[in-house]
Amino acid sequence: MKLIIFTGLVLFGIVSLIEAQAENEKACLPQYQVCTDAPGNCCSNLVCDCYGRYKSGARIGRNCFCLQKGVIYKRED
């Protein structure tokens, strides 16, 4: 009986370790990819920058993209 419990605990530990490792190896989002629903998934040299969308002064949405850290984007007319 103790052997069965011990085996179960060992298997549970192995499965938990595999799941944690798979979680850490998730593919990151490359530059210019949308990160609205996953702000923490941009690659390490990128940051998830969000911008509000407005129409006639009213906010109609929000867009987020993986962009380079420290870079400022300006609108060109």
Curated annotation (Swiss-Prot):
<keyword id="KW-0964">Secreted</keyword>
<keyword id="KW-0732">Signal</keyword>
<dbReference type="InterPro" id="IPR019553">
    <property type="entry name" value="Spider_toxin_CSTX_knottin"/>
</dbReference>
<dbReference type="GO" id="GO:0090729">
    <property type="term" value="F:toxin activity"/>
</dbReference>
<dbReference type="Pfam" id="PF10530">
    <property type="entry name" value="Toxin_35"/>
</dbReference>
<feature type="signal peptide">
    <location>
        <begin position="1"/>
        <end position="20"/>
    </location>
</feature>
<keyword id="KW-1015">Disulfide bond</keyword>
<feature type="propeptide">
    <location>
        <begin position="21"/>
        <end position="26"/>
    </location>
</feature>
<comment type="similarity">
    <text>Belongs to the neurotoxin 19 (CSTX) family. 08 (U8-Lctx) subfamily.</text>
</comment>
<dbReference type="GO" id="GO:0005576">
    <property type="term" value="C:extracellular region"/>
</dbReference>
<keyword id="KW-0800">Toxin</keyword>
<protein>
    <recommendedName>
        <fullName>U8-lycotoxin-Ls1v</fullName>
    </recommendedName>
</protein>
